[in-house]
């Protein structure tokens, strides 16, 4: 009979502990000081009770005893204070350092992700994990170092000291523990599902904010402010509603704790009062006798001590419930962070990967590709293509024809599902990723500029580039003229996302940045769509003259952008349906011919009208 092994749950905490690193020392020292503080706190009621008993007895050495016990209490209070302060300092150092390392590790992990990994986590979700989730885990880590160490120790000390004071009455405190534990577990079992939903709705809330802020110009141009407000309010209400439901359940926690301890305190007070008044009160309970309980051995001092320990236990239980709630919330945050940390990049550099790309030749051999193994349909099918080094290749196709998908396989942003992609005669999987991507510069559809000067943005291509090199590539990209029109020229500050430059200017800056890398392969993914046809032609002419040995792949919607290419590909439904130069395709491809004629008809008509005038 075969036995099926249950899949093991992933360890949530272990991936996070690796971020403690250099903060192990303060993480170990903090609990030591907390243990000292807890021990001192538990000795104070004991000696306070002895002091009360001494005063009550009114013996010959009363003042001497008062000074002795008073001195001990003062020393314990100072020791407790210093231990608490030092524990707080070390805990703050450890938790803040841990959070810093955790954010560092998360951010670096995301930087290593492939496009497929990034597709798995939405950008809003990653932002939440790097901010809110890390903050939750940081607070819980600090709480664990301090309160989570102190509470069980102080509770244990208080129980022990209660039994040393009077075993019979101490059992009353012990008896309420199972009731309180059961109530706490029940409360958290009901509340936890709400916390899971809350974090998912936090992602939706952040996504709403990101979309709105990123597309604020579109929102305003379409007068959609009210719709966006309603969408945001809905997301905010959902977070509020789930938080409210969870808090309503957790609200039972403290009252239940307080009630139980107060009942115990009342019982102890009543029984102690009877015992103090009547020495024979416990005679009826001789069968259950655990320790001596007489007026000679028990008095107001011992009663005060027991009540103090009861208050300490109440405080410990309430703090424990608070820790339990906080840890339950942060456990979901820890799970989300751990999910990112344990996710391995789908694409990794091989050991001893090839460190040099010989040339800009590209070859696709029987390539098929789909974005996930579960997908029913291939995004690319039966791709066989050969591009010689230095060739210019144009790619045309309708929306959704997988033009961008095709070029993303070249710098290995994705791996082909079937077949091989070769660059410089070598399978892209054999290259060191950094080496390959330095030689394949891609200007994507979505042009991204970062906050900083134009020079700083351009030097993403080559951080050691001289000013002369910057000017050269900007002239090739037809960007030099408009840059010099700015008052600060190349030192002009670019706002986040490039919001203070036009779409065409942004595209040309991104092209210049790519050229600065001096790549063997340059890919422009519809990267001149926002420039006029004259500027587009100037860019293409500059490429032909200045970088003839660079393989150039141009994805475009305008036939004029690719008609002078050595080779033009027509994609439809993820397949290459036509391949040839302009003259060949005009004869053999009806789609190309119709597209060309449709795009040039208006221009021809205008020229004819101009000739007749």
For each feature predicted by the language model, list its residue ranges.
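Membrane-integrated ABC transporters
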Residues: 1-41, 48, 55-73, 87-91, ...
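Short intracellular "coupling" helices and adjacent cytoplasmic loop segments at the cytosolic face
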Residues: 2-7, 96, 104-128, 132-134, ...
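Juxtamembrane helix-loop junctions of ABC transporter transmembrane domains
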Residues: 9, 32-33, 40-53, 76-123, ...
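An intracellular "coupling" helix at the cytosolic face of ABC transporter transmembrane type-1 domains
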Residues: 21-25, 112-116, 132-145, 149, ...
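Transmembrane helices of ABC transporter permease
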Residues: 22, 26-37, 50, 82, ...
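Alpha-helical transmembrane segments of multi-pass membrane proteins
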Residues: 26-27, 76-95, 146-153, 174-201, ...
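Helix-loop-helix
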Residues: 62, 71, 161-175, 245-336, ...
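ABC-type nucleotide-binding domain
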Residues: 355-613
């Amino acid at each position: 009979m075969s036995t099926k092994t249950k899949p093991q749950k992933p360890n949530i905490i272990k991936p996070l502990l690796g971020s403690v690193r250099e903060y192990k020392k303060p993480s170990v020292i903090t609990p030591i000081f907390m243990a000292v503080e807890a021990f001192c706190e538990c000795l104070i009621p004991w000696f306070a009770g002895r002091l009360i008993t001494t005063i009550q007895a009114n013996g010959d050495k009363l003042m001497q005893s008062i000074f002795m016990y008073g001195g001990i209490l003062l020393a314990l209070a100072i020791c407790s204070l210093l231990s608490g302060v030092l524990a707080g300092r070390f805990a703050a150092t450890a938790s803040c350092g841990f959070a810093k390392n955790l954010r560092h590790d998360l951010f670096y992990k995301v930087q290593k992700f492939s496009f497929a990994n990034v597709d798995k986590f939405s950008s809003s979700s990653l932002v939440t994990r790097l901010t809110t989730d890390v903050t939750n885990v940081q607070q819980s880590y600090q709480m664990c170092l301090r309160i989570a160490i102190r509470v069980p120790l102080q509770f244990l000390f208080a129980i022990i000291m209660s039994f040393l004071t009077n075993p019979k009455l101490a059992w009353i405190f012990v008896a309420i523990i199972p009731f309180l534990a059961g109530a706490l577990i029940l409360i958290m079992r009901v509340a936890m599902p709400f916390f899971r939903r809350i974090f998912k709705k936090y992602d939706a809330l952040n996504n709403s904010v990101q979309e709105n802020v990123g597309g604020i110009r579109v929102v305003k141009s379409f007068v959609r402010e009210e719709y966006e407000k309603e969408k945001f309010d809905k997301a905010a209400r959902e977070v509020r509603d789930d938080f409210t439901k969870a808090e309503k359940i957790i609200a039972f926690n403290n009252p239940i704790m307080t009630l139980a301890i107060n009942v115990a305190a009342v019982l102890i007070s009543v029984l102690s009062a009877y015992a103090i008044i009547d020495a024979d009160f416990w005679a009826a309970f001789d069968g259950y006798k655990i320790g001596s309980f007489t007026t000679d051995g028990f008095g107001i001092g011992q009663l005060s001590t027991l009540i103090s320990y009861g208050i300490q236990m109440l405080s410990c239980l309430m703090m424990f419930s608070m820790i339990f709630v906080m840890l339950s919330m942060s456990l979901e945050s820890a799970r989300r962070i751990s999910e990112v940390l344990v996710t391995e990049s789908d694409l990794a550099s091989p050991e001893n990967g090839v460190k040099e790309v010989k040339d800009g030749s590209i070859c696709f051999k029987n390539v098929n590709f789909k974005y996930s193994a579960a997908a029913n349909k291939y995004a690319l099918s039966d791709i066989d293509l050969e591009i010689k080094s230095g060739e210019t290749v144009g790619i045309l196709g309708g929306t959704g024809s997988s033009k961008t998908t095709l070029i993303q396989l070249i710098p290995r942003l994705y791996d082909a599902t079937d077949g091989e992609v070769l660059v410089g005669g070598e399978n892209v999987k054999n290259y060191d990723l950094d080496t390959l991507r330095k030689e394949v510069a891609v200007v994507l559809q979505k042009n991204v500029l970062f906050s900083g000067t134009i020079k700083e943005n351009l030097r993403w291509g080559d951080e050691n580039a001289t000013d002369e090199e910057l000017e050269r590539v900007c002239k090739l990209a037809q960007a030099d003229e408009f840059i010099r029109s700015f008052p600060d020229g190349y030192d002009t500050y670019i706002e986040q996302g490039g919001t203070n430059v036009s779409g065409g200017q942004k595209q040309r800056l991104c092209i210049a940045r790519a050229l600065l890398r001096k790549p063997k392969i340059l890919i422009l993914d519809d990267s001149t769509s926002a420039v006029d046809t004259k500027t587009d032609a100037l860019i293409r002419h500059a490429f032909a003259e200045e970088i003839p040995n660079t393989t150039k792949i141009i994805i475009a919607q305008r036939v004029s952008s690719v008609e002078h290419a050595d080779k033009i590909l027509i994609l439809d439904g993820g397949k290459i349906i036509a391949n040839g130069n302009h003259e060949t395709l005009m004869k053999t491809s009806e789609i190309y011919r119709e597209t060309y004629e449709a795009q040039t008809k208006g221009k021809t008509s205008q020229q004819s009208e101009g000739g007749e005038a």
